[in-house]
């Protein structure tokens, strides 16, 4: 109204746009004075002050990533990147740090301050151990921190998992120190070298099976490590006793395979075959006798007996024959075959 009579009032309005400095300051305080005219004179009011407090929300966000897709060997490195962002509404100051349960993280200490929305990038590397391969993955947890005044501001936890490429493997190398055999009862000595050729540790039970070694003979393994680390090996031995069938066959061929465990899963080796040749010695001995002491006239008969013995180490087969420069010899054609030590008359 005009004039503004005593006791009357008017209401004025204004808006103010908050700045980052206002948030940093913690409040907006402003002072106002009103004026009007009385004739030619200016009438000035008292000063009035209003303070509006800021809601200061210091905040820090961590985003952890890796460029390493997986790992498969001891000594492999995993590279990590940590993006640390001021997600609050007030500046933060150093020291900037990232705590990681697997590695030491390097963070830049600039800019100072770290204003809202700004970020820094920290880095770290981790070297893979055998335990990491055995575990199947590297899982690590990180947290970032910065300062707001005297207070420490802590970020969220962020976890990154990098999987292992586990390659359980077992290699069997079978050998013998026996070059050959030629008699029933000969023994063939075998050795079995079982190596963990994979990249993770293996556990018992360990076993070597051989198609020629059975009760009462067994494959005997000594000094078994537990676990069997990659590159480690153990040695087993076995003895095989030659049979007539082995001599007849011309060789002993046997196939072996090793097994171990990866947790609840069996790990099977290659099959390895060793062939030991027989020294086959076919032989025949003739023992010729007569029951006729002498003769004294034409027409007397002389009786001969021919003992034909298989004196070798392999069976012989018909036709059986004896050649005699004086007579024709009749030989039975059984048994067939004529085994070592057997004879016909």
What residue spans do the PLM features occupy?
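Exported/extracytosolic protein signature
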Residues: 1-345
